[in-house]
Swiss-Prot record:
Residues 1-314 form the Hcy-binding domain. L-homocysteine is bound via the zinc atom. Residues 873-925 are annotated as: Disordered. It catalyses: (6S)-5-methyl-5,6,7,8-tetrahydrofolate + L-homocysteine = (6S)-5,6,7,8-tetrahydrofolate + L-methionine. It comes from Mycobacterium leprae (strain TN). Residues 350-609 form the Pterin-binding domain. It is an enzyme of class 2 (transferase). Modular enzyme with four functionally distinct domains. The isolated Hcy-binding domain catalyzes methyl transfer from free methylcobalamin to homocysteine. The Hcy-binding domain in association with the pterin-binding domain catalyzes the methylation of cob(I)alamin by methyltetrahydrofolate and the methylation of homocysteine. The B12-binding domain binds the cofactor. The AdoMet activation domain binds S-adenosyl-L-methionine. Under aerobic conditions cob(I)alamin can be converted to inactive cob(II)alamin. Pathway: Amino-acid biosynthesis; L-methionine biosynthesis via de novo pathway; L-methionine from L-homocysteine (MetH route): step 1/1. This is Methionine synthase. PANTHER family: METHIONINE SYNTHASE. Residues 642-735 form the B12-binding N-terminal domain. The gene is metH. One of its GO terms (cellular component) is cytosol.
């Protein structure tokens, strides 16, 4: 066990030794048994519902319950003290009895435990501490009040003889900390130390009540020195598995679980718990085998009968009949907010610690704090989050201010508002303490040093007392009694002293120490400061070489003090890069002000490097060079500079530029001024639409990315909405698009995808067209009815599925039949379409005009051309538009000629082909070992931690494919890599934080299973039982290639003949994953509210998170499938995540409707096998999954299985 300041004492019990030797069994529910005890109101002394008073009035009843659980096989029972806390007993006006009732309850359990203890079977008592009814994080009560009440309760338990304290059903991390530290204080007072166990409660939403992910709970709890962590209450075992998996994989202490007997259902007697004793025992035995648990038991709805079955199952684990899983812990040193954990390691980058929430470093923050404008302070914190910070440095120290009051006000608010952990930065011990008492997550303390020594009254000792008690991480500055260390040797010497002191005397892990090697400005020109940059870099390198587990950090911006803002930005960025190369782990910095190294002009970068490394030479001083390069240059990224540039433009040019820039600030003022000079409709047609035209040109030339296009459309929409109330009624028709034309848009029947169609809607409607957006799954009948009713000029159809291309062809044929082809030109778009298919094949089918629109701006161009022709507007000969139209016509003529030539060649080749004999089976090896599945049938998984599967998110698919972040060609603008750093990853981090906080990502779920199967020719047969002669449940038929290797999916499953010969069938896994309906609803709300860029980004995240979850679960299946010798299928997995996207693992995952398995009807059979309605997924008549962010597949384990087409 890890030694910390909290647990370096000797325990007065052998409980932990017993836990290390075998799996132990806890008891079940107390409340359920009390309800069956036929107690009267007199038994409760009129305090109905106060179970703790029974410790005084009916100890006999409690003794009986404890005895039943022990006799059922429990090793430990919990005391009847769950509500012995200030809020519960305070509600009955008996808060003064906390210690007394805690002692009485413990004595009762102790008496029964001692009575039933034998030499072969010792019985133990856990002192139960519940959460109470008031949550300190939400300000219901104060931390110290809660902590002190828990101290009283723990003193009673120690007096009564408890073997350990169990802090259970924790809903608030700050309440949890109060209970743990209150218990530790009681042990110090009593002079008796016992272990402390913690059980957190994760709701069906996948987080604790206040939104904490399991990773946040672990990061906050483990450093407090607790001896075991686990889960209890709220759900049954099925909903707990993923959270247990996280604890098993990452906790360095024992893990336990006490689930409810399932989720309650409404029965004849009210709410009932459905899980039967054998079902609970089976689930817990599975957890022991999979997660290596140390303690299992039951919570609500469980009885002695449940515990009897559990004890029997655990006995089989302990005697080796059933294997107990081995835990392979991957420790990730982290800090946490209330909501999420942030690892110190942020490779390949560094941990960015936002510096703007600092009263000494930010004038704006300081003034807001002094004015008690806390909302502005919080907005600054949010800006740091959006800017890419991982932590927030919070400093309220300012002369003349009450730092404790300021810290309480800000830390208390940030606790619930910020998803980022907090670094508490103060020289005042009471201020640091106030922060720690308002933040339940694991904080960083900034900082300690030896400036006034390390004596008992030194600030070092006083600060470390807080660090050790609260389990915080700590920044340690290389300062000793002689002052700040400036040379490599001195920095390393002081760092060694700090590391040895903090680990040996305070029990803090090396991984929780952030050594600041200090940096000083190198911009003064003074000789003694010229080498300071080199000394810091070399000290970091040497320190990481000696102590790789120790974190390193820097207050980065000190290096550039004295330079102008733009020069500072460059020097800070270059210095950070050099420090990072030397091993720097984190930096206190304004993250959005750091430039990617490849975006800094070479001359500036070289001057900064020369300054850092003091490369002066005759006639060359890099400091002077850098100052000369930035003379009179202000920071190009500052808002103030951009506003000043806009202000210089003429009014109407400025309005158009605001559209191009997507800049809404100042828009209303400009529009008001513009309306004094021309009518609103003229402003729209002559100026705002000019801006949108420029946006289209920039997008078409690759100089503007799709997210910024949508930002421009948002501003256009806002401008039109602002002008509409000032228009004449007839002019308001612009809002309906009558000035330019009308299009009816729809996603075709059977297709639920609408992102592309909605982007077309956004671009067309903000360029003067009326768009009638019918939504998804629209039959042609409805499309044409609306087109006729609205007198549409054009019909637009979209679809993502391959099947949708067939539907589009059928729709065009129907339009021919109805005689409307000449009336309605048609625009077609969608991922499955190609230009060739539309302009050649479909153009032959349709009797009117049909056009392919690759994207929204091509759709706009086509609309302009169609409407110009309808209005009889001829293009001026020789004009750019006329020349472009002529070029398009020539290209179309060439394409059609090529198409006709290709068709003739294809017909000739087919006629010349000789018949090929297709074999019954391909050359795929049939004699491969079949892995053993962990179970047969299906299981559901809920409550998945977002952090578990975001590692499988394909960034390139998101940033390039979904968001359209494309670098500018020819070096005339940011590259794709630049955009990833400046836009992609910061926006992704922002959205993941925001969506997690809103609870939108809490509904991710999986249903998956393993099914016995054999192959017969081109069929895979799923069997009712894992026997070759078992009955058929379902049969899937797949096509076979007619040339080449003659592959068929059935070839990758063991044949029935071989299965019969070996008496062993094959295994066919199926999986279905979903992100749930809330993210789809959230996306829809963004579209309706005209938040176009947000709409694009969140939709893309939803799609790619679904794919990430599918990839993650596919890996889980490979981990669970084991071959002889206990070798898992995942042993062949690649190390790099990127290789997963290149299928760099064994086997493959196939989805019906694509490639080698084109029959989408087979999805019905898979749905019947998996029953995904249990996780909220249904299938439509068109065989589409709902919610949209869902995907399904079957998995082939065969090593030769790869994707192929038929």
């Amino acid at each position: 066990m890890r030694v910390t300041a909290a647990n370096q004492h000797q325990y007065d019990t052998d409980l932990l030794e017993t836990l290390a030797q075998r799996v132990m069994v806890g008891d079940g529910a107390m409340g359920t048994q009390l309800q069956d005890a036929e107690l009267t109101l007199d038994d409760f002394r009129g305090l109905e519902g106060c179970n703790e008073i029974l410790n005084e009035t009916r100890p006999d009843v409690l003794e009986t319950i404890h005895r039943r659980y022990f006799e059922a096989g429990a090793d430990l029972v919990e005391t009847n003290t769950f509500g012995c806390n200030l809020s519960n007993l305070g509600d009955y006006d008996i808060a003064d009895k906390i210690r007394d009732l805690s002692q009485r309850g413990t004595v009762i359990a102790r008496r029964v435990a001692d009575e039933l203890t034998t030499p072969d079977h010792k019985r133990y008592v856990l002192g139960s501490m519940g959460p109470g009814t008031k949550l300190p994080t939400l300000g219901h009560t104060e931390y110290r009040v809660v902590r002190d009440a828990y101290t009283e309760s723990a003193l009673g338990m120690l007096d009564g003889g408890a073997d350990a304290v169990l802090v259970e059903t924790c809903q608030d991390l700050l309440q949890l900390k109060a209970a743990v530290l209150g218990s530790r204080r009681a042990m110090t007072q009593a002079g008796r130390h016992i272990p402390v166990f913690v059980h957190v409660t994760v709701e069906t939403t996948g987080t604790m009540l206040l939104g904490s992910e399991i990773g946040a709970a672990l990061a906050a709890v483990e450093p407090l020195g607790v001896d075991m962590i686990g889960l209890n209450c709220a759900t049954g075992p099925a909903e707990m598995s993923e959270h247990l998996r996280h604890l098993s994989k990452h906790a360095r202490i024992p893990v336990s679980v006490m689930p409810n007997a399932g989720l309650p259902v409404l029965g004849a007697k009210g709410a009932e718990y459905p899980l039967q004793p054998d079902e609970l025992a089976e689930a817990l035995a599975g957890f022991i085998a999979e997660f290596g648990l140390s303690l299992v038991g039951g919570c609500c709805g469980t009885t002695p009968d449940h515990i009897r079955e559990v004890a029997a199952a655990v006995a089989r684990c302990n005697d080796g009949t059933v294997p107990r899983g081995e835990r392979h812990v991957t420790y990730e040193p982290s800090v946490s907010s209330l909501y999420t954990a942030i690892p110190f390691a942020q490779k390949p980058s560094v941990l960015m610690i936002g510096e703007r929430t600092n009263a000494n470093g930010s004038k704006v923050f300081r003034e807001a704090m002094i004015a008690e404008d806390y909302q502005k302070c919080l907005d600054i914190a949010k800006d740091q989050t959006r800017g890419g910070a991982h932590l927030l440095d919070l400093c309220v120290d300012y002369v003349g201010r009450n730092g404790v009051a300021d810290m309480k006000a800000l830390a208390g608010r940030l606790a619930t508002v910020s998803t980022l952990p907090i670094m508490l930065d103060s020289t005042e011990i009471p201020v640091l303490q106030a922060g720690l008492e308002h933040l339940g997550g694991r904080c960083v303390i900034n900082s300690v040093n030896y400036e006034d020594g390390d004596g008992p009254e030194s600030r070092f000792v006083k600060t470390m007392e807080l660090v050790a008690e609260h389990g915080a991480a700590v920044v340690a500055l290389t300062i000793d009694e002689q002052g700040q260390a400036r040379t490599v040797e001195k920095k390393v010497e002081v760092a060694e002293r700090l590391i040895n002191d903090i680990t040996s005397n305070w029990g803090v892990d090396k991984s929780a120490i952030l050594i600041d090697c200090l940096t000083f400005t190198i911009a003064t020109g003074q000789e003694e400061s010229r080498k300071d940059g080199i000394e810091t870099i070399d000290a970091i390198r040497e320190l990481k070489k000696r102590h790789p587990a120790v974190q390193t950090t820097l207050g980065l911006s000190n290096i550039s003090f004295g330079l102008n803002p733009s020069a500072r930005q460059v020097l800070n960025s270059v210095f950070l890069h050099e420090c990072q190369e030397a091993g720097l782990d984190s930096a206190i910095v304004h993250a959005s002000k750091i430039l990617p190294i490849n975006r800094i002009p070479e001359e500036q970068r070289q001057a900064a490097l020369d300054l850092v490394y003091d490369r002066r030479r005759e006639g060359y001083d890099p400091l002077q060079k850098l100052m000369w390069l930035f003379k009179g240059v202000s920071s190009p990224s500052s808002k103030e500079t951009r506003e000043a540039e806009l202000a210089k433009l003429p009014l109407f040019d400025r309005l158009a530029q605001r559209i191009v820039d997507g800049e809404r600030n100042g828009l209303d003022v400009d529009l008001d001024e513009a309306m004094t000079q021309k009518p609103p409709l003229a402003i729209i047609n002559e100026n705002l639409l000019d801006g949108m035209k420029t946006v289209g040109e920039l997008f078409g030339s690759g100089q503007m990315q799709l997210p910024f296009v949508l930002q421009s459309a948002e501003v256009m929409k806002a401008a039109v909405a602002y002008l509409e109330p000032h228009m004449e009624k007839s002019d308001c028709d612009f809002g309906k698009g009558l000035a330019k034309g009308r299009i009816v848009l729809a996603t075709v029947k059977g297709d639920v995808h609408d992102i592309g169609k909605n982007l077309v809607d956004i671009i067309l409607s903000n360029n003067g067209y009326e768009v009638v957006n019918l939504g998804i799954k629209q039959p042609i009948t409805n499309i044409l009815e609306v087109a006729e009713d609205k007198s549409a000029d054009v019909v637009g159809m979209s679809g993502l599925l391959v099947k949708s291309t067939v539907i589009m062809k059928e729709n065009l044929e129907e339009m021919n039949t109805r005689g409307v082809a000449e009336k309605f030109p048609v625009l077609l778009g969608g991922a499955a379409l190609t230009r060739s298919y539309v302009e050649n094949d479909l153009a032959e089918v349709y009797e009117g005009e049909v056009h392919y629109a690759r994207d929204a701006f091509e759709g706009l161009k086509l609309m302009d051309t169609i409407m110009s022709a309808k209005r009889g507007e001829a293009l001026a000969p020789g004009s750019p538009e006329s020349l472009a139209a002529e070029a398009d016509r020539n290209k179309e003529t060439e394409r059609k000629a090529r198409h006709e030539r290709s068709k003739r060649i294809a017909v000739q080749r087919k006629a010349a082909e000789e018949p090929v004999e297709v074999p019954e089976r391909s050359d795929v090896p049939s004699d491969v070992e079949v892995p053993a599945p962990p179970f047969w049938g299906s299981r559901i998984i809920k409550g998945l931690a977002v952090a578990d599967y975001t590692g499988f998110l394909d960034e390139r698919a998101l940033f390039l494919g979904q968001w359209g972040l494309r670098g500018v060609r020819g070096g005339a603008g940011p590259s794709y890599e630049d955009l990833v750093q400046t836009e992609g990853r910061p926006r992704l981090r922002y959205w993941l934080d925001r969506l997690s906080t809103y609870g939108v990502l809490a509904y991710a779920a999986v249903v998956y299973g393993y099914f016995p199967a054999v192959s017969e020719d081109n069929d895979i047969v799923v069997l009712a039982e894992p026997r070759p002669d078992a009955e058929q449940r379902y049969r899937f038929t797949f096509p076979r290639q007619q040339r080449g290797r003659f592959l068929c999916i059935a070839d990758f499953i063991r044949s029935r003949d071989l299965a019969t010969e070996r008496s062993e069938v094959d295994v066919l896994p199926f999986q279905l994953v979903t992100m749930g309906q809330p993210i789809a609803d959230f996306v829809g709300e963004l579209f309706v509210s005209n938040s176009y860029r947000d709409y694009l980004e969140v939709h893309g995240i939803g799609v790619q998170l679904t794919e990430a979850l599918a990839e993650y679960w596919h890996r889980r299946i490979r981990e669970e499938l084991k071959f002889s010798g206990n070798r898992t299928m995942s042993a062949d997995d690649p190390e790099a995540v990127e290789d997963y996207f290149k299928l760099g693992y064994r086997g493959a995952r196939f989805a019906f409707g694509y490639g080698a398995c084109p029959d989408l009807e087979d999805r019905i059979k898979m749905m019947e096998l998996l029953q995904p309605e249990r996780i909220g997924v249904t299938i439509s008549e068109e065989l589409q999954l709902h919610p949209e962010q869902s995907t399904d597949a079957f998995v082939l384990h065969h090593p030769a299985a790869k994707y192929f087409n038929v």
